[in-house]
């Protein structure tokens, strides 16, 4: 599929929903400067998100969705990275803050659940200690209080026999249990905005369903704003209020999630919808694939 120069399809119905604005992104660009040239990962993305709502960011691998989330959180580090535009969180432009100011926000007001819990958790440190250290760094609690809170969080994310598992190392847990620990750590300081970047990657279908339901439950109970990054439209169906569809670093469609599924307007979103496998399909029926290939981000037209 070639890069489309069609305008972004935007619905205004979700914009009128209640709640104050917690996040507003304006004309965000992120480029990586490589030996082969400038890789334009995010190109002029703008959107806003109301407090307590959930947003899905979907697109193929390489569409820029993860880079967008990391750019908002100021996590794209390196001398070869350039980010411009604005990302206002509770009225503060995150891109204008110093690293010290951002460190005060990371984990406390804004948190992220990463794709692979084996790389986001320290393999040499017991899981309970990792949550405890996170609490003690950002909250005025002693070790005993932090340990009890960590245990409560592990129980809350439904880790069986949390009392005995709190002293386990990450490799001693299954992939699903490790992701639950990552969620507990992200929720420890009660952030108002949570990014979940492909939180069910490499998990089996049953565990995926459990993790997604857990995130939805925590988001509702805490009245937390959540951004779910995924390549799978099935992940956001019935779980997010609004959706952005990204292609080649741009948002090509944004609307309420119900509208995305009921009356898709952009050809790329339609192609994504057609590519979803359905149980109603006859056996041996070829899967619908998106024709062509994504554009190379260093050689965009």
Indicate where each model-derived feature is located.
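Conserved ABC ATPase signature
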Residues: 168-173, 177
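A short, flexible loop at the N-terminus of ABC-type nucleotide-binding domains that lies
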Residues: 18-22, 31-44, 75-81, 98-102, ...
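Short catalytic/signature loops enriched in Gly
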Residues: 9, 16-21, 160-164, 256-301
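P-loop NTP-binding/switch modules centered on Walker-like glycine-rich loops
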Residues: 60, 74, 195, 199, ...
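Conserved ABC ATPase "signature" region
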Residues: 92-93, 145-164, 273-274
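A short, proline-enriched helix->beta-strand linker immediately N-terminal to the Walker B motif
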Residues: 188-192
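Conserved ABC transporter NBD signature motif
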Residues: 81-93
């Amino acid at each position: 599929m070639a890069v489309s120069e069609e305008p972004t399809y935007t619905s205004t119905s979700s914009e009128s929903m209640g709640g104050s604005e917690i996040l507003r992104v304006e004309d965000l660009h992120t480029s990586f400067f490589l030996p082969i040239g400038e890789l334009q990962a995010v190109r002029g993305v703008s959107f806003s998100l109301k407090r307590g709502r959930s947003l899905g960011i979907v697109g193929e691998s390489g569409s820029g969705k993860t880079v967008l989330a990391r750019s908002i959180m100021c996590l794209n580090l390196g001398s070869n990275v350039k980010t411009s535009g604005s990302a206002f969180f509770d009225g503060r432009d995150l891109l204008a803050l110093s690293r010290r100011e951002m460190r005060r926000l990371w984990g406390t007001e804004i948190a992220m659940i990463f794709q692979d819990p084996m790389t986001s958790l320290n393999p040499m440190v017991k899981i309970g200690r990792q949550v405890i250290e996170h609490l003690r760094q950002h909250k005025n609690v002693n070790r005993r209080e932090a340990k009890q809170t960590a245990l409560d969080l592990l129980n809350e994310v439904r880790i069986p026999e949390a009392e005995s598992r709190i002293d386990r190392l990450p490799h001693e847990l299954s992939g699903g249990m490790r992701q639950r620990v990552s969620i507990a750590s992200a929720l420890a300081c009660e952030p108002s905005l949570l990014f979940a970047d492909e939180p069910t990657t490499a998990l089996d279908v049953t565990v995926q369903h459990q993790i997604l339901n857990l995130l939805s439950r925590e988001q509702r109970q805490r009245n937390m704003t959540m951004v779910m990054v995924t390549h799978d439209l099935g992940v956001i169906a019935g779980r997010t209020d609004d959706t952005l569809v990204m292609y080649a670093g741009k948002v090509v469609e944004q609307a309420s999630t119900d509208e995305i599924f009921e009356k898709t307007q952009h050809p790329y979103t339609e192609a994504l919808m057609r590519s979803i496998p359905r149980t109603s399909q006859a056996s041996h029926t070829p899967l619908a694939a998106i024709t062509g290939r994504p554009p190379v981000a260093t050689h965009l037209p």
